[in-house]
């Protein structure tokens, strides 16, 4: 038999297999991030991977709609794989309106996007995130941004910056320039400002008819500044917006130092459901974008008919793992028990069960390898102790335990290990 052709042995394009060392690294990140969310009073939630397509497309925007894994099931229903967790959570809240608010939920879940795979980016990937639902307070904004920073630090990000904006500020700027009708083109351009040269970004804005001088004004205004400087900029654009932003900055500064945060009007986020404060996190020497979020005060009304303010963030887990250098975690076997003959098997199994009850990982040799092969095998898989049991050891009432790290060997009474 020739087996499967090579392309069928590999995962579907954009997907990945998780080998044990990689999966243990993922689980470590899951434990770290979940612990931070729990400490802030958030509780874990999960939803089905499959959603009605209409639910996913409700406020996604055409670019995201094009990335949805879409299909019809055997009953003819139009379905899709979730592309984030915010939309499914909004749907869950739509039939749980009696929950006490604010609701604080978090997740660590698989999501799917049919975009072009590239290094570090897959079509199936994990997101960690939080949603704070039922509060319009700037304290809620500050809490979620603080939680994002705490999550990055807990994950091992020693170098990071969180860039913050408010979509209403961009709209006020466009209004002052008489350019609100060009909003979509401007948002598209600003979303690419950190990735493309100045002329290309301005070209995207002017391609829809926006005058060049207005495009240049928008580009130059959308520059990085401190949060304190941003308060004054926003006050000049709109007094009420500036005062609201000043409160947000005050509450954030009360919780964390502000040097990790910058105001950047080019941060608009690609999803169409954001309505206010938006932010993105960049990590490491290459400032890898690992996640972001913002306020989406209109989204829940689309599903429930009730206006409920909300905000949250999502982190691309694999991107964060790459940024902090967490690619694999070795988990060596604690004990490998080798027996020289069948008479020792029942003693080996009894010892293995005893050690497992104590929390150790234990393997008993299946009788297909000689001692030389076993030595090679246990070193390759990573093992701390090799236990040897044979007729001579049983006659003496002992087992031999070889420490494969320190390269020492001792005899230990079998009764002491079993008691």
UniProtKB/Swiss-Prot annotation:
Pfam families linked: HGTP_anticodon, tRNA-synt_His
UniProt main location, coarse: cytoplasm
A single GO BP: L-histidine biosynthetic process
Compartments it resides in: Cytoplasm
GO MF term (any one): histidine-tRNA ligase activity
Enzyme class: ligase
Enzyme Commission identifier(s): 6.1.1.21
NCBIfam families for this protein: hisS
Keywords annotated in UniProt: Aminoacyl-tRNA synthetase, ATP-binding, Cytoplasm, Ligase, Nucleotide-binding, Protein biosynthesis
Family under the similarity heading: Belongs to the class-II aminoacyl-tRNA synthetase family.
Cellular component terms (Gene Ontology): cytoplasm
Record protein name field: Histidine--tRNA ligase
Domain of life assignment: Archaea
SUPFAM superfamilies: Class II aaRS ABD-related (SSF52954), Class II aaRS and biotin synthetases (SSF55681)
Catalytic activities: tRNA(His) + L-histidine + ATP = L-histidyl-tRNA(His) + AMP + diphosphate + H(+)
